[in-house]
Amino acid sequence: RAEYSLFDRQTGRPMCIGNGETCQRLTNQGVEHHPCPSPDLCPLAQGGACKPFGRLHVNLDESAELGSFIFRTTGFNSIRTLAARLAYYHAASGGLLSCLPLQLTLRGKSTTQSYRTPIYYVDLTLRDGTNLKDAISSAKQIDEQSKAAGFYQEALDHVARQGYGNASFEVGGEEG
């Protein structure tokens, strides 16, 4: 999930969170809904205070079955790369993204824009030693076994989306 966030630099609390279309802004009257024209066009965001903010919830093999690690980033390259990879793997696996053996990989690149200084971003790749054909075959088996045991990923995803939608500002105190 990626969106734009403007934080109060003194408290670390969110002041405005938007998706490029609409935003929720904290004012003296409470949380108000406004259009979100993106950081480049928003008068509140002048001076680079509003940044892209991405969160990727990842289930780790050794963690609790419903536990997750949350990768948070304000890096545009990481957000763009992760969004593209998630879409690719979701399409290639026929929607079995949660069953694929994936890993986060730190990559570096240098560009003319970065004056040849390396910039680092996170990529989503198949686990080392795994090819796409085998990963998809394994994902199908995992999905069938999970469903046979009564586990439905679609229902879990739906409930998670509902939970996100219920929060005025999703960023909790520990995330500020």
Residue spans for each PLM region:
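OB-fold ssDNA-binding interfaces and closely related basic DNA-contact patches used
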Residues: 1-63, 115-119, 165-170
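Extended serine/threonine-enriched, polar tracts that run as long, contiguous segments within proteins
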Residues: 45-135
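Eukaryotic intrinsically disordered, low-complexity regulatory regions
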Residues: 134-176
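Residue-level detector of solvent-exposed, low-hydrophobicity positions
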Residues: 11-14, 78, 159
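Intrinsic disorder/low-structure terminal segments
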Residues: 3-6, 68-70, 75, 150-151, ...
